[in-house]
Amino acid sequence: MTVKMYTLSTCGHCKSAKKFMGENGVEHHFTDVDLLSGDERKQVLDEVRKYNPGCSFPTILVGEKVIIGFNELAIREALGL
């Protein structure tokens, strides 16, 4: 299962989520939203708001499940770890 994460490059919780995925061998893709600009940034922020109206980070998509923030237990449950 591939995990999609919306993150900020300066966010400590986002860094923890990325580290967790790497340490557990979870295939994941992330987008550091703060490093985008212009229309691309607006488009990605609109996408984040679909899953997380508060637009907070990290926003993590595991299949159909949305996890807001770095919640290791919720991530483990969603991934079956």
Feature map (PLM): residue ranges:
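A short, hydrophobic beta-strand/beta-hairpin element that forms part of a small beta-sheet core
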Residues: 58-67
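Short alpha-helical
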Residues: 12, 39, 74
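Thiol-/selenol-based redox modules, centered on thioredoxin-like
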Residues: 74-81
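Local sequence-structure signature of Cys/Sec-based thiol-disulfide redox active-site neighborhoods
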Residues: 1-31
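Short polybasic/polar patches that bind polyanions
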Residues: 22, 49, 77
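Thioredoxin-like thiol-disulfide oxidoreductase module
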Residues: 33-54, 81
